[in-house]
Amino acid sequence: MSSEHKRSLPAVTLAAIGVVYGDIGTSPLYTLRECLSGQFGFGVEPDSVFGFLSLIFWLLVLVVSLKYLTYVMRADNAGEGGILTLMSLAGRNTSDRMTSVLVIMGLIGGSFFYGEVVITPAISVMSAMEGLEIAAPSMDSYIVPLSIVVLTLLFIIQKHGTGSVGKLFAPVMLIWFLTLGVLGARSIIANPEVLQALNPMYAVRFFIEYKAVSFFALGAVVLAITGVEALYADMGHFGKFPIRLAWFTVVLPSLVLNYFGQGALLLKNPEAIKNPFFLLAPDWALIPLMILATLATIIASQAVISGVFSLTRQAVRLGYLPPMRIVHTSDMESGQIYIPAINWMLYIAVVIVIVSFEHSSNLAAAYGIAVTGTMVITSILFCTVAVKNWLWNRYLAWVLLAGLLVIDVPMFLANVVKILSGGWLPLALGMVMFIIMTTWKSERFRLLRRLHEHGNSLDAMIASLEKSPPTRVPGTAVYFSRATRVIPFALLHNLKHNKILHERVVLLTMRTEDAPYVLNARRVTVEQLSPTFWRVIANYGWRETPDVEEVFQRCWQDGLTCQMMETSFFMSNESLIIGERPWYLRLRGKLFMMLSRNALRAADQFEIPPNRLIELGIQVEI
């Protein structure tokens, strides 16, 4: 490790604390309260307190420390993580049929994230505001309005970026975790017997004593690990080692101290179950703690919002969502983006959820099913990568998968039973996103295949045009082409109606590769097809923004000179009509047409100057 890297490690680790662990770091606000609130029939008695504390501790160890930090984070694509990245890795060395299954699983996992992201800001901020019930009971009726005000401000500032205020995230979250640890340690010192719950036998006894009821209680325990996917998804921003270092040195000790501190408080004063987190603090510290908790939940919400922006960009670039406007809010950091459509749809959904559920306890029932569903899918995809990509011993990989699913599946099933009491919300939101993603991908493929089937051979067309050239006009024309062997429809229609060609014709294909970045050496390929025709293929990673001007600069190195303001850009604009289909495919076709109408135009994606653009319409039956 270089000295430069050593100097930067503390800063990167601190930044990881501020972004990666926001969601899981605010879980102590409500987790133990929900476990012992009475909904599962558990009283605040020693056996249940010790049992839940033991379960929480060993979930943090087995799921976060072992599964994600030790195993899952090994699966990266050029340093990037996340469920869609894992899906792509898993499908690289498998059969077409198996790849289709893995893609569906990955899209379900991604859809679950969209369902979860609506709940996280709502439950986090409401839990912080509920400190008012302790500090000033008369302010109880203001919890919902204040939560909406805080989140409204958060969503408004998204368009300005979080670069400046983001520098405060890490120090605030560090103070938050230190506060968690101090509050918990004070309580543990007063009642150290609570540390017996570190023994896993208390978790085992919990299941033996409470039998079937203990299974349903897993639906509440899982609240302690919500946000665990962020560790993997944010790997590309901070790297594996800083994320692991932050967890083992700061986050895990602070969480364990706080959970066990709440447990010690409940053993001493069972009536503290109404809000054991805030009752850990002395009276004079309630208001400062509530302010700090609000800041921490805002940061946790910001991390989730940024995460959904990143996931959306990846889905758009990989062809699972229609193109949409993506604004870069920082000249220095490519990961800082803002997507207006997603931002405001998410805001409306969050406000509706807050108004409908009114209290964080009501939302807790909805929380968990998306998280645990994604955990199950992650385990399966990871073991597929281990066997197919890394050539692990098949039997050892299956043993590992069985061990992971022994934890994941019961937690998922325990949350499934909560569907009627709120679990339907993330499932419904996830289903909507899954339908949209699969519809866009499959119908777009169908459209491109139809265009390809009805297209003319490029080589034959060029040979014909060179042999019997039409009228030539000065200048360069760029035709955007999706398929490299078929003549673009815009070129075909230009010849058909205008009977002319420019002196130089460039067929430009913009491709997105299944990788976050593409090496500069592979960015642009230039091929001269004839004295007047060139084919240019530009390759970009899904984290990169296609730039036509950059493509032109690289073309110059290969002997092809193009100037943006001296070039005419031709694009085809498809007008879609639905052919004969079964009723359910007609519905899917109509959804695709609606998505296409609202998608960002290719000219806007590539920032083509409007006065240099010519669009030619074609009608296509789908």
From Swiss-Prot:
It catalyses: K(+)(in) + H(+)(in) = K(+)(out) + H(+)(out). The chain crosses the membrane at residues 9-29, 49-69, 101-121, 137-157, 165-185, 212-232, 247-267, 279-299, 337-357, 363-383, 397-417, 419-439. It is found in: Cell inner membrane. It comes from Pectobacterium carotovorum subsp. carotovorum (strain PC1). GO terms for cellular component: plasma membrane. InterPro entries: K+_transporter, K_trans_C, K_trans_N, Kup. Signal peptide: none annotated. GO terms for molecular function: potassium ion transmembrane transporter activity; symporter activity. The lineage of its organism: Bacteria, Pseudomonadati, Pseudomonadota, Gammaproteobacteria, Enterobacterales. It comes from the Bacteria. Belongs to the HAK/KUP transporter (TC 2.A.72) family. Keywords: Cell inner membrane, Cell membrane, Ion transport, Membrane, Potassium, Potassium transport, Symport, Transmembrane, Transmembrane helix, Transport. Responsible for the low-affinity transport of potassium into the cell. Likely operates as a K(+):H(+) symporter. This is Low affinity potassium transport system protein Kup. It is a multi-pass membrane protein.
